[in-house]
Swiss-Prot record:
Coiled-coil portions: none
The species this protein was found in: Rhodopseudomonas palustris (strain TIE-1)
Keyword Ribosomal protein included in the entry's annotation: yes
Name of the protein this chain belongs to: Large ribosomal subunit protein bL20
Assigned protein family: Belongs to the bacterial ribosomal protein bL20 family.
GO biological process terms, semicolon-separated: ribosomal large subunit assembly; translation
Any one annotated GO CC term: ribosome
SUPFAM superfamilies tied to this protein: Ribosomal protein L20
RNA-binding as UniProt keyword: yes
């Protein structure tokens, strides 16, 4: 069997890790052992935060809706209850966007929700 020299393969693998570690501070960008650990940890954070992002944005939309319905004399939970009773099926992301960009349309929805609660 012929001898296999691994220099080219090792260099390619290291290059791949260094490319991912570009922009890191200190030895984390140019020492293979620390760069590999840093890149692995970054991947763990990225995986975790892709899940967390969904929760964070939903919480943001809820906070925006709570602030938007307060002038109409309602809280967020009362508003959502009114929406379900009135049969309006719009998700929180769209409602939040309406509250910011289309206040008149959001006001109409809020009034319908309030009317459904009164009935």
């Amino acid at each position: 069997m012929a001898r296999v020299k691994r220099g080219v393969t090792a260099h390619a693998k290291h290059k791949k890790v260094y490319k991912l570690a570009k922009g890191y501070r200190g030895r984390r960008k140019n020492t293979i052992r620390t760069a590999k650990a840093a890149v692995d940890k970054a991947g763990q954070y990225a995986f975790r935060d892709r899940k967390r992002k969904k929760r964070t944005f939903r919480a943001l939309w809820i906070q925006r809706l709570n602030a938007a319905v307060r002038p109409f004399g309602m809280t967020y939970s009362v508003f959502i209850n009114g929406l379900s009773k009135s049969g309006i099926v719009v998700d929180r992301k769209v409602l939040s966007d309406l509250a910011i960009n289309e206040p008149a349309a959001f006001q109409a929805i809020a009034e319908k929700a309030k009317a459904a609660l009164a009935a």
